[in-house]
């Protein structure tokens, strides 16, 4: 019984450490990944670009995505 409890606590500690490592900033956001909540965590040579979103003239959000540096996107009409 003690072995089962010890094993469960050990596995819980391992999972907690893995999650803490991911949140510590060592993991970067890849190309086209959303960076709205953490704009400084895009991988190397990638920028976090944001745009305003409007629906019926009302701003509904400000989504941000990791995009390549020095790339300009134009709107298709």
Swiss-Prot record:
User: Main localisation, per the record?
Assistant: secreted
Tell me the keywords, alphabetical order.
Answer: Disulfide bond, Secreted, Signal, Toxin
* Propiece span(s): 21-26
**Pfam families the UniProt entry points to:** Toxin_35 (PF10530)
Which tissues and organs express this gene's product? Expressed by the venom gland.
> Where is this protein found?
Secreted
Signal sequence span per UniProt? Answer: 1-20
Which segments of the protein form a coiled coil according to its record?
Answer: none
Q: Any transmembrane segments, and where?
A: none
List the molecular function annotations (GO) for this entry: ion channel inhibitor activity; toxin activity
Extract one GO cellular component term from the record.
Answer: extracellular region
Is Transmembrane helix one of the keywords? no
Processing after translation: Contains 4 disulfide bonds.
- Domain of life of the organism encoding this protein: Eukaryota
Extract the InterPro entries matched here: Spider_toxin_CSTX_knottin, Spidertoxin
Family per record? Belongs to the neurotoxin 19 (CSTX) family. 09 (U10-Lctx) subfamily.
State the name under which the record lists this protein.
U10-lycotoxin-Ls1d
Record the organism: Lycosa singoriensis (Wolf spider)
């Amino acid at each position: 019984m003690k072995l089962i409890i010890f094993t469960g606590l050990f596995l819980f500690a391992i999972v907690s450490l893995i999650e803490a490592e991911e949140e510590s900033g060592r993991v970067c956001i890849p190309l086209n990944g959303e960076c709205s909540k953490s704009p400084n965590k895009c991988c190397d040579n990638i920028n976090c670009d944001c745009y305003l979103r409007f629906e019926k003239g009302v701003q509904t959000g400000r989504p941000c995505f990791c995009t390549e540096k020095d790339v300009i996107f134009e709107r298709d009409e």
